Amino acid sequence: MTFTELCRPIFEQAINDYHKTDNVDAPINNPYPLKSIEYYLYLKNWIDTVQWHFEDIIRDPHIDPAEALVLKRRIDKSNQDRTDLVELIDSYFL
């Protein structure tokens, strides 16, 4: 099995799991063993999926400015979490 073949179903599962609630505040229920590459791949794709929905929310022209600021900070934190996770996943290839 190639790495791509490993990733694809994990990414699809994370997206499908997110869409069970369609809620950026839904808890992550990662089904993979902690600290496994599968766990990190699922988590990364969950963060990506939530991030896409954050971006949709913040583009609402009627968003309250105070809510937008709170969301902007969540987006910034999510971006950093994603960057840290990508670096961790990259370490599997070193």
Each model region followed by its residue ranges:
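Anionic, Ser/Thr-rich low-complexity intrinsically disordered regions
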Residues: M1-L94
